[in-house]
Every structure is written in structure tokens, then in C-alpha cells.
Amino acid sequence: MHILVVSVNYRTAPVEFREKLTFQAAELEQAMNTLQNQKSVLENVIVSTCNRTEIYAVVDQLHTGRYYIKKFLADWFQLEIEEVAPYLSIFEQDGAIDHLFRVTCGLDSMVVGETQILGQIKDSFLEAQQVKATGTIFNELFKQVVTLAKRAHSETTIGESAMSVSYAAVELGKKIFGDLTDCHVLILGAGKMGELALQNLYGSGARKVTVMNRTLTKAEVMAEKYMGHAKPLSELQCALLEADILISSTGASEYVITKEMMTKVERMRSGRPLFMVDIAVPRDIDPAIDELEGSFLYDIDDLQGVVEANRAERLKEAEKIQFMIEEEMVLFKTWLSTLGVVPLISALRDKALAIQSDTMESLERKIPNLSDREKKVISKHTKSIINQLLKDPILVAKELAVEEGAGEKLALFAKIFDLEVEEAGNTEEVEHKRAWTPSVPSL
């Protein structure tokens, strides 16, 4: 078995292409179910955010897995594979594991050290678990990844200077307007990104805030937290007349603000400039609006310059986290290598228990007057003898599984105990069964 990541992200693709490959939250369950039925795919988790769409998969063959995951992406978004392939990054085995750790810890984010991605990875994994798209390997890997990411943020200072994309948008506004106290701010979208932006705006002194959302009650709840006002989206054109700063993140599939709408608004603004930041993917604001004289539009890719300001300090802390990742990878790979010994240990236990069962039957025939209590006591003690005898061989088998040449050594182990196990010790050939998937503690 192999671990594979197929990624389109802000490093490999511009926002115009990323928005074509963005899964909506409501369709993730169906998408993971569909991917799970693809040839070669044994487990999968799909992560889709404004900066990345990534497929994490356990596959039986790397070449086949790569092809069918690319095909799945192309088919799902009604594109040709040739259109998608140039924008993809592919990570395999150690590279895939390292990538997942780095992404979850915020080391691969546009804003290094941000914590929002940790919640997004965790949510995607839990949803994949619910639809039974994960199994033995990802249940363990994602548990370790989320645990390490939490530890990385608590044991380093990377979060102290890190910014979210929402905060970067606010920083850009402060550079242009300076004091935000007298600026009228309009927030489109009452989701996480919108609230993060509003939280940072409020912390920077903004007090004239209007929140708009398709569902007015959500806008009202968010506006109330920060002493703002809520309006229905039907009043958008009027709200644009009053705003100095607009930050938009609605998650709509079409432009919420068109060039035609903004052209009409500009005529009534009497030359007042409007600073617009579109942090949605797909974009909320028609990019053609940037051609208008009084509108200054920035999208999510334009925020990179703001992000770089604090990058050097955060990268020092990132080096510490990378060391933590490397240590955790050793632990995971050690665990992974022991999967090959599971059938061997099961076969050894089964053989020993079969001998114990045969012995009990023989004993009952020879001593037919045994009471039920006596049978129970004898059975308990004979099983105890078996457990004591197996303890050391099982420990040795686990040690052999992580040594060089594990396959040959475990094959010899199986021969010594006369065990019939196919491909003993070969992790890549162990049958992938969820029947023996361990339960995963709550994250």
C-alpha cells in the first residue's frame, strides 16, 4: 500500500484556476464516496479551502492511483485531464506524509503558522471517517498529525506573529487608510472567513461595520458581537454607496458584485474611492471591476505581499516544528511497518488457541466428571500459560518487523512456528481490511 497526495494550491495555480477545482462543503461527502469507488483507491480524505484542494489517498499502486485521482478531479469538475495536470503537485510515501504534517501545522500556508488549516484538516478527516472513506492507515496518521499540530502551536511561538488571510486583508486596509475608526466597513458573508476579518477589523479600531449575508439572521448574530449592523443582501447596492472598505467571502458560485452593478454605484459615490478585498474562492467580485477608476480591488493572491512582512520571524519557529515533524514521521513509519506482522501474530494466536481448545476437549473426554466450574478454571489457566508462552515470540516478531530485511526474517519466524501466512512481513501486500481497524480516540 502507498500514501499519495494530489494537490492544487496557491503555489501551483492562480486563483482563477483554483476556483474551478473547489469542492463545496455540501458535496464533500458525495465526492469522497465517489473517489472511494475509484480503482486503486483504498482510503481517502479530501481537503478543499480557499488556498488549496488536496486529495490524500491510500492506494494499492502508485501509478494507477495517480491516474485515477487525476481522472476523478477532471471528471468531477468537468475538465480534461490535460487541463488539470499542469497545476497539480504530487507527493508520494514519505513526501506525502511530510506534506500532510506541514500543511496541518500551517507550514505550507500562505500565512506560515496560521491555525485555521488545522481545523479544516480535522473537519475533513472526521467527515471522511463518517462516510467510511478512511481505514487503518489514515485513522492512525491523521490522529498523529492533528495531535502534533496542536503541540507545535503550543510549544512554539509561531502563532504569535502568524496571520490569517483575513487578518492580512485587514492589514492591507490599514496601510491604505491608516486609522480605521472613521471608515465604514462592509462585510459580505457571515462564515468563518468573514467573522475572522470582522474580528481583526474590530481589534484595529473599526466601529462602523455592516454585515450582509443571504441569511439575515446569521448576519445579525455576527454583527451583534461587534456592535455592527446587519442588512439583507437585497440592499447590497445601497450598502456599497456608504462603504469605504469592503471585504467579501460569501462562498457563492457566481459573482455577487458585477462590473455593471459597480459602475452604477460609482456614479453615485461622487468620486469617493472604495477599497475592495475579495478573499472568497470562487471569487465574489468580478475582477473587471478593477478597471473602474474609483474601485481598488484585491483578491486572495494579492495578499501575498502583506503576508511576507512577518514571514522571516515565523520561519525560525517553522524550523523547530519541522524537526518535530521528522520525529513524528519516524514514529508513524515504525507503526506502519508493524502492520505486516499483524496477520502473523493473529495466526500464531489462532494456532495456540486451537491447541488449547483441542486439549480441553481431550481432557473432558478423559475426565468426564469435571464440573463446569472446574472446566472454567482449567480453561482459564491453560490460556494463561499460552499467553505467557506467546509474550516473548510476539515481542520478537514486532521487533523484526521494523528491522532491515523484515520480510525474510518474518518468513523464517513463520516457518519456525509452522504458520501459513501470505506475504508475512510485507506491509505493502497486507490485505487492507477495515474489519480490524482500531477505534480512534476523539480529536
Curated annotation (Swiss-Prot):
BP GO annotations: protoporphyrinogen IX biosynthetic process
The entry's keywords: NADP, Oxidoreductase, Porphyrin biosynthesis
Gene3D superfamilies listed in its UniProt record: Glutamyl-tRNA reductase, N-terminal domain, NAD(P)-binding Rossmann-like Domain
Active site location: 50
Entry GO MF terms: glutamyl-tRNA reductase activity; NADP binding
Site feature: Important for activity: 99
Positions with a binding annotation for NADP(+): 189-194
InterPro entries: 4pyrrol_synth_GluRdtase (IPR000343), 4pyrrol_synth_GluRdtase_dimer (IPR015896), 4pyrrol_synth_GluRdtase_N (IPR015895), GluRdtase_CS (IPR018214), GluRdtase_dimer_dom_sf (IPR036453), GluRdtase_N_sf (IPR036343), NAD(P)-bd_dom_sf (IPR036291), Shikm_DH/Glu-tRNA_Rdtase (IPR006151)
Comment field on protein domains: Possesses an unusual extended V-shaped dimeric structure with each monomer consisting of three distinct domains arranged along a curved 'spinal' alpha-helix. The N-terminal catalytic domain specifically recognizes the glutamate moiety of the substrate. The second domain is the NADPH-binding domain, and the third C-terminal domain is responsible for dimerization.
PANTHER family: GLUTAMYL-TRNA REDUCTASE 1, CHLOROPLASTIC (PTHR43120:SF1)
Role played: Catalyzes the NADPH-dependent reduction of glutamyl-tRNA(Glu) to glutamate 1-semialdehyde (GSA).
Family to which this protein belongs: Belongs to the glutamyl-tRNA reductase family.
UniProt protein name: Glutamyl-tRNA reductase
Organism of this sequence: Bacillus mycoides (strain KBAB4)
